[in-house]
């Protein structure tokens, strides 16, 4: 199984940490790829940040489908 874990903010350090945590608990044979959008806020701390993160998040979800991930 291939899982694309999408951090909705653009902070790479957080994305890397999320990926490490997910890989630690993933079943054997599961590939976890952690990504963050190329556009959006560095953190999500309110409604405005949520709205600003949505376009980049949706772009990553669509890309995951095209890339053949089993789950995003």
Residue ranges: model-predicted function:
Residues 1-58:
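N-terminal glycine-rich anion-binding loop in soluble enzyme alpha/beta folds
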Residues 54-72:
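Glycine/small-residue-rich loop that forms an oxyanion/phosphate-binding "nest" at active or ligand-binding sites
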């Amino acid at each position: 199984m291939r899982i694309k874990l999408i951090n909705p903010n653009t902070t790479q350090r957080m994305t890397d940490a999320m990926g490490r945590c997910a890989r630690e608990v993933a079943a054997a044979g599961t590939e976890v790829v952690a990504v963050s959008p190329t556009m959006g806020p560095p953190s999500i701390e309110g409604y405005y940040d949520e709205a600003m993160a949505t376009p980049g998040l949706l772009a990553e979800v669509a890309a995951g489908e095209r890339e053949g991930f089993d789950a995003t």
